[in-house]
Amino acid sequence: MTDLFQEPKDATPLAPEERDGLRLSWVTTRADLNVAEQDNIDKGAAWAFRARRRDMLTVDFVLQLHKRMFGDVWTWAGHYRRTERNIGIAPYLIGVQTSQLMGDAAYWVQHETYEPIELAVRLHHKLVFIHPFPNGNGRHARLMADLLLQRLGVPALSWGGGSLNDLTALRRAYVDALRLADREDYEALIAFAQS
């Protein structure tokens, strides 16, 4: 038996039809998948930081970034999820809520509603809360936050300074901070993002 689709306890497992979207036949273990995804994420991040797009707070960019981060590994990369999850909103609301979030974030930037770090952390949290994709939501949202900070002339966040992919105390602190942010308490998530 392979551990390929074994997720950390607090992660959202892929539906069978989403698992079928794996493009790489050589990926047979979780470690293989982690390597393949990280290589793809690195390519996507390099593209995004080079692009320096002014219009990054758009649905089109949200989808394009996810595709650039995961498209070499998954056929569904850059497409909204169509399956229910134990976290996130109903699939039929994803497009509307993502569009609304991008509009809100553009407003926050234009009107300096929040300090840059809080603004980026709120964008990250709301994207994770919506959970638009079958997988990679946290990694995508953290990169969106860092890209926004770059646009605002602020250094990227450290997000705890380690891997959040495995079940560790670091991931537990991250998930706990996200849950507090679900109740509009952003203090712990802001602190975590800067640690």
Feature locations, PLM:
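FIC/Doc superfamily catalytic core
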Residues: M1-S195
